[in-house]
Amino acid sequence: MSFVVALTGGIASGKTTVANLFHDQFGIDLVDADVIARDVVKPETEGLKAIAAHFGQAILHPDGSLNRAALRERIFAAPNEKAWLNQLLHPMIRQGMRNALTQTTSPYALLIVPLLVENQLQTMADRVLVVDVDEKIQIERTMARDKVSREQAEAILAAQASRAQRLAIADDVLKNDAENQKLLPQITLLHQKYLAMSRQNL
């Protein structure tokens, strides 16, 4: 398995942009926790079968896929149901990430985990890279991107780990405050650093 760098950051911090630059500029393999989280609840998976057995068939669309809106509604006001769902899916997602990481072939791999701090997944990586953005900018970007109100954007931010909590576990920090932030020079330096570290890790 490659040397693993976990990439995290709050909502609208620019994680996807950063990950794509690592991939497009330097050919670094990406493993995205959000993609794996969707994969483990696809039709015919054990994850979706367990969800349907627990919540009933009304949680599915007519085509057999998960009705995410219905599921969100069911767990929103029921912390015990949310806890049940997390207990079911988190081990599946962790295993999916491990499996995907074993398939990577670049000198190091980027493991993209938005909720790294919240789910205490930093042990899955050799290094943690945090994309850091001022919270006011996060709120503005979230409002513009997701077409939500300021109150909704603030609520999303409040539900995530704080900026300080993320920075506390960071080995490396990539600043992405400005609209025209020069990301590539920062990423190039980090890439060179991770290449050197991955060679030492052999």
Swiss-Prot record:
PROSITE patterns, per database record: DPCK
Binding site for ATP: A12, S13, G14, K15, T16, T17
EC number(s) recorded for this UniProt protein: 2.7.1.24
Origin: domain of life: Bacteria
Similarity comment: Belongs to the CoaE family.
Pathway: Cofactor biosynthesis; coenzyme A biosynthesis; CoA from (R)-pantothenate: step 5/5
GO biological process, one term: coenzyme A biosynthetic process
Domain DPCK residue range list: 4-201
Single annotated GO MF: dephospho-CoA kinase activity
Function text: Catalyzes the phosphorylation of the 3'-hydroxyl group of dephosphocoenzyme A to form coenzyme A.
One of the record's GO cellular component terms: cytoplasm
Localization per record: Cytoplasm
Protein species of origin: Vibrio cholerae serotype O1 (strain ATCC 39315 / El Tor Inaba N16961)
Alphabetically ordered keywords of this record: ATP-binding, Coenzyme A biosynthesis, Cytoplasm, Kinase, Nucleotide-binding, Transferase
Alphabetized InterPro entries for the sequence: Depp_CoAkinase, P-loop_NTPase
Lineage: Bacteria, Pseudomonadati, Pseudomonadota, Gammaproteobacteria, Vibrionales
Annotated protein name in UniProt: Dephospho-CoA kinase
Catalytic activity: 3'-dephospho-CoA + ATP = ADP + CoA + H(+)
First-level EC class: transferase
Gene that encodes it: coaE
